[in-house]
C-alpha cells in the first residue's frame, strides 16, 4: 500500500450549487485529504464524517495494456453514486468529480463539483 497526502491546487473547487431552485456557478472550499492506494489497485480516501471513515474508489487502468498508462487510475466510488477520481501516480495529479445531486436528488444539499490537485507520497 502507498499513502499520499493530497490537496486541491486551486482556490477551492468550481462547480454548481442549487440556490433558489436553480443550479448556479459557485466556488467551494479547498480540500485536503489522505489517500491510500491499496494493494488491490483501489483507492481509499479518508473521510471522518462517514461511518466507515473512508470513501472507497474501485479503479481500473485507462487504455488497459498500454505501458504508458500502467500507473494511471480511473476510479468510481464503490456505491456507483456519481463520484469519480482520476489519479496519476507518476506526477501525483488528480481530478475528483461529484455529480450525484443534480441527477438523482431534488434537495438543495448536493452540488456538482470538480476538484483538481496534487498528491505527495508519505
Walk through the language-model features, giving the residues of each.
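A short, solvent-exposed beta-edge/loop patch
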Residues: 81-103
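N-terminal helix-cap/turn-to-beta initiation motif at the start of protein domains
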Residues: 1-5
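Contiguous, well-ordered beta-strand patches that form the walls/edges
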Residues: 38-89, 118
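Short, solvent-exposed loop/hinge segments that bridge or flank secondary-structure elements
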Residues: 7-49, 82-87
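A short, polar/proline- and glycine-enriched secondary-structure boundary/capping micro-motif
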Residues: 16-18, 54-60, 106-108
